[in-house]
Amino acid sequence: MVFSSFPTYPDHSSNWQQQHQPITTTVGFTGNNINQQFLPHHPLPPQQQQTPPQLHHNNGNGGVAVPGGPGGLIRPGSMAERARLANIPLPETALKCPRCDSTNTKFCYFNNYSLTQPRHFCKACRRYWTRGGALRSVPVGGGCRRNKRTKNSSGGGGGSTSSGNSKSQDSATSNDQYHHRAMANNQMGPPSSSSSLSSLLSSYNAGLIPGHDHNSNNNNILGLGSSLPPLKLMPPLDFTDNFTLQYGAVSAPSYHIGGGSSGGAAALLNGFDQWRFPATNQLPLGGLDPFDQQHQMEQQNPGYGLVTGSGQYRPKNIFHNLISSSSSASSAMVTATASQLASVKMEDSNNQLNLSRQLFGDEQQLWNIHGAAAASTAAATSSWSEVSNNFSSSSTSNI
């Protein structure tokens, strides 16, 4: 772009007379010259430049101060700014409150983003009102609510403390009532640790818990006398009266007292150590009669008899009727077995030992026979002695 130079004139009154002459300016655009002539007819006086009002930024809330605004604060983009741009006059700042007639009021905002509903606040009664709207009867303001909340919180704190104390007292009372109820019903609460469990068992075995004479109940059910020592670490059997086994005329619970072949379960019952019977594998094989050991045990303990299984004893008075009813069949079986074994000659010592062990195991499971079966028992005993003599003679001859 090529611009022609403008003639410069000193600031003198004679320069205004030369304004009547035309001024020729040449403006060239890429080699093209365009001549424009400006022919002003009358000189125009210099116009004063209108300066906009200075805007002072507010450091507190980012608003700007505008002359004539309510309080001098208008936020950019707010409803007041929109009202100013729309040339709507802002409401008066000091209006009378419709309730208390106080002039200590201020304009807050336009309600519902509508320029026709300006909202005001009265600092005296702390209430809001909107022009053209209903008056609010509920006081709205931070000061009153803060004071009320502070008073309520202080009073509420005392109330919460008293309520907490009452709750703790109620819980303590309920715990005491539960404890007394448990003691009245002879029930103990769940143990909290192993020490409390051990103390409970010790007090139970010692008979410290009232209403539970479990030793006498156990002795009565098992057919034991009151002279026998109490059964330690044994659960009470008075709760199992309705659980019985029906064998004809016999109606009694079946409790196996003692251990198996190793006798491990009998060690838990301290009161039955003297009635334990030796295991099957500990019996000698030659020259001994198992019925002699049975008679010796019965003489020491007349209230007990041998029960099916190794090392198990049980009261004879419970199963007396059962033995009496099956005495004839047992005697016939013993006689037939003895007669058959008497006619057999063994050639191998291993077979003799196995047969004798089987015989001992079968005959050991027989119970004591009373009444009319005494004669058959004597015959079986004599047959057993003959069989044992034949075994010893045949074994010596084979050796």
Curated annotation (Swiss-Prot):
Signal peptide: none
Chain sites annotated for binding Zn(2+): 97, 100, 122, 125
Protein's UniProt keywords contain Zinc-finger: yes
One Pfam family per UniProt: Zn_ribbon_Dof
Keyword Amino-acid biosynthesis (UniProt): no
Induction per the UniProt record: By cytokinin in procambium.
Name of protein: Dof zinc finger protein DOF5.1
Organism: Arabidopsis thaliana (Mouse-ear cress)
Gene coding for it: DOF5.1
